[in-house]
């Protein structure tokens, strides 16, 4: 998801204070704590030992599991929690996680939270209130240094420094005791956990246990200790006090109690991490495999133009992309191949590789402008035999029942949009992370993910992709008499559409992004 909403991480009732930039304050580097420093970490270490360097993986393919896993990791953590996110939106799910983070800090767990600066727009004081806890540290990545006080000055500041400010930290990482991590496409917010009344994102996360978590810990440290990461209190004229934090906690408790009374079903659904914990069960279901954690260097965002290839996640993934020989399946919520991607995909298809892509349709995407960057490439891709599947808008239950992707219907009748990012190479390896197949992920934003060498795990991810490509869920774009048509299924009957589904406003947004040449920024 692209930025557009604002974060309210803890206390929607707190008042905002004007912020100002201050001089950089010298700070000590900080590293992940040893995985063996806690009982939980040692239990993971003992579980992983027989697998001789392999790590354990389990997909979290539905929103309930994804939320429960995060909440349970906070509860299990004994020494450290490291969170790195592009977007954190206010909502019931976020408030529950914040409450658990505060409880973890109370019992002595060190909590480090690294947020992309766009998350904090206009909310520095609110976010910084959390950091008043002695066990919680919060930093912002690639922050705007001047003009933070109002929305207007922030917009102006980003515009005047656009070459740096459009480059964002898109990473999503959740790490407990340097032993268990969650990677994937989900940010934090109700729309990612099936708790938002207007939109639910269909996504894939992966529970990652053992040595891979330590690799991801190194990734977190690189970003945390980067010169681009600044403590949030550097942007405040005065720091929130312990009393401010206590007031926030009181309001947080009142808010969650109100949710319990007013929306008891949703409250109970999210609280299953307390009533029916699953972590011990999931640990027995892990797939143990060789793997590689991949991430962009934080300094990628400092490049004057295109970054040095040595800094890029895609360079680390290049051997897999080049080496695929039989089947390549890609899931990318935002897909803009550009000329290099077009050459790569058509080249693989021409070499006899079965290439299939699942992305959002125009009617389903939350960013129609990105669809405008994808649409001009469809015909060339289809001419070379690349199979294109565009996920249909999946209406919530208020709009009728029907098939839904990844075995999940929205709890509150919300429409669903694809937000997943994954690749499957020759049914042997799977890559899951925050990376979209578009110029923004390749060149401008930073990303993180894990490549797993396991036919079993690759098979699970492939099954999810094929489910999404089913004609009842997606439009398959095809060529008919030289023109693109969309083949789909309704009520068991196949039919062909000659006009792309989507409202006139979505069409206009897609057309506009193409017309003004935004592709390289998408």
Regions found by a protein language model. Give the residues of each.
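Bacterial N-terminal signal peptides that target proteins for export
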Residues: 1-8
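Charged, low-complexity intrinsically disordered terminal segments
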Residues: 5, 19-172, 176-522
């Amino acid at each position: 998801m692209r930025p557009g909403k604002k974060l309210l991480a803890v206390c929607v009732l707190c008042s905002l204070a004007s912020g100002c930039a201050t001089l950089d304050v010298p700070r000590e580097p900080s590293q992940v704590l040893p995985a063996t420093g806690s009982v939980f970490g040692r239990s993971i270490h003992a579980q992983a030992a027989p697998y001789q360097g392999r790590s354990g993986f389990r997909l979290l393919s539905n929103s309930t599991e994804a939320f429960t896993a995060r909440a349970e990791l906070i509860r299990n953590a004994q020494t450290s929690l490291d969170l790195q996110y592009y977007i954190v939106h206010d909502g019931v799910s976020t408030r529950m996680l914040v409450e658990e983070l505060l409880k973890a800090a109370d019992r002595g767990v060190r909590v480090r939270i690294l947020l992309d600066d766009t998350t904090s727009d206009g909310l520095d004081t609110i976010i910084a209130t959390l950091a008043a806890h002695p066990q919680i540290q919060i930093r912002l990545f690639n922050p705007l240094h001047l003009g933070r006080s109002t929305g207007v000055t922030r917009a102006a500041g980003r515009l005047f420094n656009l070459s740096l400010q459009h480059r964002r930290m898109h990473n999503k990482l959740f790490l407990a005791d340097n032993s268990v991590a969650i990677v994937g496409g989900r940010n934090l917010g109700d729309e990612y956990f099936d708790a938002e009344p207007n939109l639910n994102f269909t996504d894939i996360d992966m529970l990652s246990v053992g040595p891979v978590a330590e690799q991801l810990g190194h990734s977190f440290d690189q970003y945390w200790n980067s010169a681009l990461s600044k403590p949030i209190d550097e942007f405040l004229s005065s720091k929130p006090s312990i009393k401010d934090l206590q007031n926030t906690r009181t309001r947080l408790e009142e808010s969650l109690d109100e949710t319990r009374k007013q929306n008891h079903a949703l409250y109970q659904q999210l609280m299953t991490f307390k009533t029916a914990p699953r972590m011990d069960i999931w640990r027995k279901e892990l797939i143990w495999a060789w793997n590689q954690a991949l991430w962009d260097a934080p300094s990628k965002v400092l490049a004057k133009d295109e970054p040095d290839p040595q800094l890029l996640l895609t360079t680390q993934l290049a051997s897999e992309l080049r080496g695929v020989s039989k089947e390549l399946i890609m899931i990318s919520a935002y897909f803009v191949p550009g000329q290099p991607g077009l050459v790569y995909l058509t080249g693989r298809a021409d070499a006899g590789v079965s290439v299939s892509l699942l992305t959002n349709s125009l009617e389903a995407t939350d960013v129609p402008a990105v669809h405008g960057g994808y649409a001009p490439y469809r015909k060339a891709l289809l001419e070379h035999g690349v199979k294109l599947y565009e996920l249909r808008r999946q209406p919530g239950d208020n709009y009728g029942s029907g098939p839904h992707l990844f075995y999940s219907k929205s709890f509150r009748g919300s429409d669903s949009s694809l937000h997943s990012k994954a690749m499957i190479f020759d049914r042997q390896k799977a890559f899951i992370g925050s990376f979209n197949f578009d110029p923004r992920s390749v060149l401008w934003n930073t990303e993180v993910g894990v490549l797993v060498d396991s036919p079993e795990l690759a098979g699970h991810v492939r099954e999810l992709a094929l489910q999404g490509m089913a004609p009842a869920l997606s439009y398959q774009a095809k060529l008919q008499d030289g023109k693109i048509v969309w083949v789909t299924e309704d009520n068991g009957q196949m039919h062909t559409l000659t006009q792309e589904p989507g409202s006139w406003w979505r069409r206009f947004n897609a057309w506009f992004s193409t017309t003004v040449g935004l592709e390289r920024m998408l």
